[in-house]
Amino acid sequence: MKLSMPRFDRSPVLVVGDVMLDRYWHGCTTRISPEAPVPVVKVEQMEDRPGGAANVALNIAALGGAATLVGVTGADEAADSLARSLASAGVDVHFQRIASQPTIVKLRVMSRHQQLLRMDFEEPFATDAAALAAEVEGLLAGIRVLVLSDYGKGALKNHQALIQAARARGIAVLADPKGKDFGIYRGADLITPNLAEFENVVGRCADEGELVARGARLMADLELGALLVTRGEHGMTLMRPGHPPLHLPARAREVFDVTGAGDTVISTLAAALAAGEELPQAVALANLAAGIVVGKLGTATISVPELRRAVQREQGSERGVLGLEQLLLAIEDAHAQGEKIVFTNGCFDILHAGHVTYLEQARAQGDRLIVAVNDDASVTRLKGPGRPINTVDRRMAVLAGLGAVDWVISFAEDTPERLLEQIRPDVLVKGGDYGIDQVVGADIVRAHGGEVRVLGLVENSSTTGIVEKIRRQP
């Protein structure tokens, strides 16, 4: 499946659901209490993070989407902490505050990144369902996706009123469901239960065939547009009426903490669909996002550079032949990782030992090496009739196969000034007997804070010499 990064800044999403505060007390444990056989945690840091529906909205905002959040809280310090965190991240917050009840707080006591204890402070909210529905309806103008983030804590009382209000306006409805009655989500465009939640409703599935069959019946019974079952280490399965199931394997490189992974899935789905992505592509992006977030501690968000890097890795463009847009994204991510970008250019018509040695030396000047290759027309202009021997596609394919080369791109001009203006490498490398001021593009690179270095060439090793030698053969 071909993936690309959506324009998330075009993603207006309304999130409605159970808001909670994830509170962390971080410290270390070095002894057992003399009062009882329990560890003593010396608390060194306290941290608050938005959780539940608030985490969904925060994830959408972290991707650059326009997130609006409607939820229910108490009139207390925890609600104030949530509102501050969300507002600072750009989320438009609409809380229905109930003075007689506390904001839901999940307090986790951590010792050296290990969770020792979780304490929940909560009561089911006595929500004014009519007032909440009226507020939601007043916010639907301009929204592309409505997310129902349901943790069963009482914020969502009349699901159907919200679903029908959105559908009447052509707004897609996504629901992260809870409980045994999925009928309350009837008519939703997509629901995203995890496997345990799904089997709690349809019964245990012996294999994927049974999972798909029961999913199809559920979609038909509830008039759902689609069903996405998240399956932990087994990835996720997308089912749509009239389409074969789409199974996506898990993409986590390391699982550290699964807290909030479901929030990440539905938030990425919502942002991608609001940005115009088709559902299979949006699901694939959500799968990559989940693989990133489970490698983080606690309730967490992912950034655009993190997701972009995962997309590039998935598409095999972490290395190889790239177009300009792909290359600029790869450079941005490399710089975010603190990597130094090296650039060199040439015709590389017949790759020889001198080229290989030179490229290895160039790569040693930094962390990533870009090789820009003259296209066929420019090689002919520079080298004369009969050149190039190899087409630009073949030349780039050979270069991309070298261990020293990270990215290869072609250019149509005789010299790479235009490309250098766009790429702005940290180091420009050229081989030969040049002064630095004679290197084409040196002024451009130095104007942007880069360096220019000249490397020696391997003697008695040149493409022109090889071509002439071949032509002299009888």
From Swiss-Prot:
GO cellular component term of the entry, any: cytosol
Keyword Nucleotidyltransferase: yes
Sorted UniProt keywords: ATP-binding, Carbohydrate metabolism, Kinase, Multifunctional enzyme, Nucleotide-binding, Nucleotidyltransferase, Transferase
Region (Cytidylyltransferase): 343-474
CDD domains in alphabetical order: RfaE_like
Segments for region (Ribokinase): 1-317
Family annotation (InterPro entries): Bifunc_HldE, Carboh/pur_kinase_PfkB_CS, Cyt_trans-like, PfkB_dom, RfaE_dom_I, RfaE_dom_II, Ribokinase-like, Rossmann-like_a/b/a_fold
UniProt-annotated binding residues for ATP: 194-197
Top-level lineage group: Bacteria
UniProt EC number: 2.7.1.167, 2.7.7.70
Keyword Thylakoid attached: no
Any Gene Ontology biological process: ADP-L-glycero-beta-D-manno-heptose biosynthetic process
Enzyme active site: 263
GO molecular function annotation: ATP binding; heptose 7-phosphate kinase activity; heptose-1-phosphate adenylyltransferase activity; phosphotransferase activity, alcohol group as acceptor
Catalytic activity, reaction form: D-glycero-beta-D-manno-heptose 7-phosphate + ATP = D-glycero-beta-D-manno-heptose 1,7-bisphosphate + ADP + H(+); D-glycero-beta-D-manno-heptose 1-phosphate + ATP + H(+) = ADP-D-glycero-beta-D-manno-heptose + diphosphate
Associated pathway: Nucleotide-sugar biosynthesis; ADP-L-glycero-beta-D-manno-heptose biosynthesis; ADP-L-glycero-beta-D-manno-heptose from D-glycero-beta-D-manno-heptose 7-phosphate: step 1/4; Nucleotide-sugar biosynthesis; ADP-L-glycero-beta-D-manno-heptose biosynthesis; ADP-L-glycero-beta-D-manno-heptose from D-glycero-beta-D-manno-heptose 7-phosphate: step 3/4
UniProt xrefs under Pfam families: CTP_transf_like, PfkB
Enzyme's top EC category: transferase
Quaternary context: Homodimer.
Function: Catalyzes the ADP transfer from ATP to D-glycero-beta-D-manno-heptose 1-phosphate, yielding ADP-D-glycero-beta-D-manno-heptose.
HAMAP family xref list: HldE
Membership in a protein family: In the N-terminal section; belongs to the carbohydrate kinase PfkB family. In the C-terminal section; belongs to the cytidylyltransferase family.
Name of the protein in its database record: Bifunctional protein HldE
Organism: Azotobacter vinelandii (strain DJ / ATCC BAA-1303)
Gene coding for it: hldE
